[in-house]
Amino acid sequence: MSRRNRTKKYTPLIIIMLITVAAVLGVAYYVLKDDLYFLQERTVSPDGNITLYIKHTVSGDSSRYRVSQRTDGNKLRYYEWTTDKLETVWADDSSKCAIRYTTGSGNEVTDVLDCVSGKIIQASSMSSLSLRYYMTQTGYELYDEIPVDLKFTGWQGDCMCYKFSTVNTSGIELSGNFDADYSNGFAIKQFVRD
């Protein structure tokens, strides 16, 4: 049998195999496209010496972020967060990075990554913090421990800057901002009314 005849003989079989493979791949893509994918991105520190690699994976209803750090080309470690959205905000001196995300219950959380040691050094739920409010009324000093919803707005030196709005125990609406020292359990450094 000549080469041309052999080619003609197997051509229908090859076509059928290609169609079958294409169909299987098409079905697999249709089934899995909404259940599993990942997006790799990165963020570089202001001084350019530290790179964080962010891998976003979605499987079914679960959205997960994995952040790994590299310094001088060496991969140190990684951390994972289950959330639909994750943001990173570098400190001016590049030594720390705030990792901001929202939990499944809707609480905004800010973790602090120490980029020198590669460790998470502070984790705080924004809805669990309280603010001690001072005012003078008829000669008395009143102190209220007020649960507040804080929004992280950025770094100022070693302090993390937050805006807040809340109502104290006397029903007075409060809003403003303060700087919190990440190394001392978010001690209030400054209280400013808007």
Question: Which residues make up each language-model segment?
Answer:
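Acidic, small-residue rich beta-repeat scaffolds with periodic aromatic anchors
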Residues: P12-L13, A22-Y37, E108-D194
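Terminal domain-start segments
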Residues: T20-W81, G176-F191
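Acidic/hydrophobic-patterned starts of short beta strands in beta-sheet-rich repeat architectures
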Residues: T51-L52, K96-R100
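Short glycine/acidic-enriched loop and turn motifs that connect beta-strands
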Residues: T57-G60, T102-N107, V167-G171
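Beta-rich catalytic cores
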Residues: D84
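Blade-terminus and WD-like Trp-Asp/Gly-His loop motifs, strongest in beta-propeller folds
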Residues: E41-N49, T88-S95, K151-M160
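N-terminal Sec-pathway targeting helices
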Residues: R4-V21
